[in-house]
């Protein structure tokens, strides 16, 4: 009886829905019956909107599923559901409210609702105290905006939504404002809304009185695109087999020439895939897209000075201000005295504060302002009463600050710091050497003669610029090396023809011919030729090459290598005791942001005390798994096998058994040979 009831169409909505989708005109009467039933349920719901109604929820989902089949009857249905939600969303039953939202999402996926009005309604629903609903709406909003901008940027919809979000960020409801901010941040990270307007709307959240909103906005601006790119690269590299997987597969399989060839082929394919260049993402960091960074930084500093938030939030504010000042080269002179208050060795997170001081330094800041900052670091950190680690951190911070603002360093302070080159602590000694090495390239004249080292081409060409002076060149420095190399290549081509003709004659002998790659010798000859040229002639050649030809990436790589070689090669006229040094061309360029490793770099790790070593050893033991194979039985209650019983049996009971007595043992001669082989093997190892 129940089965027959389930097949009746008026009471079985899923079956009716399935049939209507197959043939809408055939079931129009059943649809109209359900539609009238839906209307009467809506009228009842309006009288008591706070009461749950399972029947109405089923009818709303049914209508949403078949709305595309009867557009003439259900043209006003989406607007009706939206009105019910917008008027009663605060008092609605949570399950019924979720059903209404799902029905609207279904209608939007069928493109039966305008996205702007629906998304505005969903943003308003963020005010509801329903975590599951907020999560569902958040996912739909991000996905829908992504689909809207999939083929091309839909600026009409984007502008309307961005303006609406700007008002939502200032909403009195903190939850709604936070969710709206999360949507904007997610859209920026997914490269959907990566324009300046989105970034400048998010800047308003940095002045929110709600801590969660403030922290979310600061975290967004402190995020780095480079890190995200590396993460995405590492995620993509995890897909598919690695070289280790292929080697393990070969080692565990059958050893044959066919399998070996398969392995080599697979390794080649893997290498080729790794070498494939991915499309570059031309995505600036959000800090670059701020319209008025000077005004933004001043407001942030004012907020920081009267901030009553936790210390971690203050650190984030300091970090953002320092990045703004360093990247945009702003004038924010009150920021440096503010940082000086925290520059004490006992200060919490002092290495990060030193990093912020270095980030906020640039060549346009007047040297007098940075000088007071340097003296504070030197007086508080680089003194003999402090430990070696504290002194090292102080010298590293001074080095990073002066690398960005060289004019701030005084000759007296530099000479004092250079004396630590012979300090007993290796970390202090090495950090002082790095500071000396920096000034050998920046301004060797400030160092004492014994610390200047052997003069190189780069140190002779180095020139100290005055405050505010620009060094504008009308040529590419180092471009003169290209023309010389071109001539050398022409000569090498002629030599190449001669060598090939010789090799053809000698090929009949069937002997191997040694081919000598003389790239190192060529580079030495090029550097000799350039050294013999006067400086004026070099500049003229570089200017001629820069204006007469289009330089390729390979040309720029050669120029960069030549400029790096200048720092190694001795100056012309001096006795060249140095050998030619090969330069690593894969060296990563230094970014515009500093890393905490630059400040905390210790060349020698400090010894850990006994308690720390014991704690690490004990932690390792707890995490370690037993290297024993667990005996697993199909039936845990079954008895042990005869084989297991044999292993566990006492030897004295097995001693006189037939199996032991009839066992084949090694003869005396076999034992002699085994001993001899073992002794020979041991002697080889001793050698």
UniProtKB/Swiss-Prot annotation:
Residues 483-525, 604-669 are annotated as: Disordered. One of its GO terms (cellular component) is nucleoplasm. It holds the Pfam family SDA1_HEAT. Residues 490-512 have a biased composition (Acidic residues). The modification Phosphothreonine is found at residue 552. Its main location: nucleus. InterPro entries: ARM-type_fold, Sda1, SDA1_C, SDA1_MD, SDA1_N. Residues 253-315 form a coiled coil. Highly expressed in testis, kidney, spleen, brain and fetal tissues. Also expressed at lower level in heart, lung, liver, small intestine, ovary, uterus, mammary gland and placenta. The keyword Secreted does not apply. The keyword Cell membrane does not apply. It is found in: Nucleus, Nucleolus. Required for 60S pre-ribosomal subunits export to the cytoplasm. DAZL and PUM2 bind its 3'-UTR mRNA, suggesting that these proteins may regulate its translation. This is Protein SDA1 homolog. The gene is SDAD1.
């Amino acid at each position: 009886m129940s089965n027959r009831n389930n097949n009746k169409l008026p009471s079985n909505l899923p079956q009716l829905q399935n049939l209507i989708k197959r043939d809408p005109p055939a079931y129009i009467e059943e649809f109209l019956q359900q539609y009238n039933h839906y209307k009467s349920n809506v009228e009842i719901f309006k009288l008591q909107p706070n009461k749950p109604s399972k029947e109405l929820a089923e009818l709303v989902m049914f209508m949403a599923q078949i709305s595309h089949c009867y557009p003439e009857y259900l043209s006003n249905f989406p607007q009706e559901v939206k009105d019910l939600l917008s008027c009663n969303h605060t008092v609605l039953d949570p399950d019924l409210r979720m059903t209404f939202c799902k029905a609207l999402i279904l209608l939007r996926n069928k493109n039966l609702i305008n996205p702007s009005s629906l998304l505005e309604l969903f943003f308003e629903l963020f005010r509801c105290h329903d975590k599951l609903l907020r999560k569902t709406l958040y996912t739909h909003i991000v996905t829908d905006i992504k689909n809207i901008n999939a083929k091309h940027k839909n600026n009409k919809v984007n502008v309307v939504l961005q303006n609406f979000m700007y008002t939502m960020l200032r909403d009195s409801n903190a939850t709604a404002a936070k969710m709206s901010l999360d949507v904007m941040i997610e859209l920026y990270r997914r490269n959907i809304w990566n324009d300046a307007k989105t970034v400048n709307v998010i800047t308003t959240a940095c002045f929110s009185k709600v801590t969660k909103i403030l922290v979310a906005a600061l975290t967004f601006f402190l995020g780095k695109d480079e890190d995200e790119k590396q993460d995405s690269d590492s995620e993509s590299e995890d897909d598919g087999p690695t070289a280790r997987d292929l080697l393990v597969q070969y080692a565990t399989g059958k050893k044959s020439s066919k399998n070996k060839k398969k392995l080599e082929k697979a390794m080649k394919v893997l290498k080729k895939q790794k070498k494939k260049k991915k499309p570059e993402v031309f995505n600036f960091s959000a800090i670059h897209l701020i319209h008025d960074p000077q005004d933004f930084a001043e407001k942030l500093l004012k907020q920081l000075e009267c901030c009553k938030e936790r210390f971690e939030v203050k650190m984030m504010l300091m970090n953002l201000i320092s990045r703004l000042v360093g990247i945009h080269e702003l004038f924010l002179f009150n920021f440096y005295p503010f940082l000086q208050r925290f520059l004490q060795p006992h200060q919490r997170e002092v290495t990060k504060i030193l990093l912020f001081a270095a980030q906020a330094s640039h060549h346009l800041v007047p040297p007098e302002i940075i000088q007071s900052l340097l003296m504070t670091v030197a007086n508080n950190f680089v003194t003999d009463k402090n430990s070696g680690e504290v002194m090292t951190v102080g010298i590293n911070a001074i080095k990073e600050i002066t690398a960005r603002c060289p004019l701030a360093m005084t000759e007296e302070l530099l000479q004092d710091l250079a004396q630590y080159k012979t300090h007993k602590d290796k970390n202090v000694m090495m950090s002082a050497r790095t500071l000396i090495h920096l000034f050998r390239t920046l301004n060797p004249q400030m160092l004492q003669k014994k610390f200047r080292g052997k003069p190189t081409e780069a140190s002779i060409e180095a020139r100290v610029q005055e405050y505010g002076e620009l060094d504008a060149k009308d040529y590419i420095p180092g471009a003169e090396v290209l023309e010389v190399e071109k001539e050398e290549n022409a000569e090498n081509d002629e030599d190449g023809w001669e060598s090939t003709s010789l090799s053809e004659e000698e090929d009949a002998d069937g002997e191997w011919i040694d081919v000598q790659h003389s790239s190192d010798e060529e580079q030495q000859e090029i550097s000799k030729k350039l050294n013999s040229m006067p400086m004026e002639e070099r500049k003229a050649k570089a200017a001629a090459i820069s204006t007469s030809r289009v330089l390729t990436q390979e040309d720029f790589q050669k120029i960069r290598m030549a400029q790096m070689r200048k720092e190694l090669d001795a100056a012309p006229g001096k006795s060249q005791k140095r050998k030619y040094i090969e330069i690593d061309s894969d060296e990563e360029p230094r970014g515009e942001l500093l890393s905490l490793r630059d400040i905390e770099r210790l060349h020698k790790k400090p010894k850990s005390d006994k308690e720390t070593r014991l704690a690490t050893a004990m932690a390792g033991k707890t995490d370690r798994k037993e290297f024993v194979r667990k005996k697993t039985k199909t039936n845990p209650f079954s008895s042990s096998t005869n084989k297991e019983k044999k292993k566990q049996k006492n030897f004295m009971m097995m001693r006189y058994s037939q199996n032991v007595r009839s066992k084949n043992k090694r003869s005396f001669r076999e034992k002699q040979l085994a001993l001899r082989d073992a002794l020979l093997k041991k002697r080889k190892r001793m050698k």
